[in-house]
Amino acid sequence: MKKLKFNPNIYDTIRKNIKKYRKEKGMTSAQLAELVDLSHDFIRQIESEKTAYNFSVDTFYKISVALDVRLDDLIK
């Protein structure tokens, strides 16, 4: 059986894509936080490359809906 390869930096990929798509929509992190009912500080931590902060699938889903982006687009 072929061994699967996993992206060890998946959270970094998602963080960068959240920030990219948010900016493409002309949205601030505060606006995104309000849409997904999370604190502005929490969204900033998610987007920060300096913070090793992981987030739930629920949060990931809410952000994708708020940004009108498919989940798989956020992990590419």
Language-model regions, residue ranges each:
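Short, basic-rich loop-to-helix N-cap that marks the start of a DNA-contacting helix
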Residues: 50-65
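Alpha-helical residues within the helix-turn-helix
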Residues: 23, 34, 65
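Short alpha-helical DNA-recognition segment
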Residues: 26-46
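Residues that mark the N-terminal boundary/hinge immediately upstream of a DNA-recognition element
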Residues: 17, 28, 56-59, 70
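Short C-terminal boundary/hinge segments that cap the last helix of small helical domains
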Residues: 68-76
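A short, Lys/Arg-rich alpha-helix, primarily the initiator
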Residues: 2-24
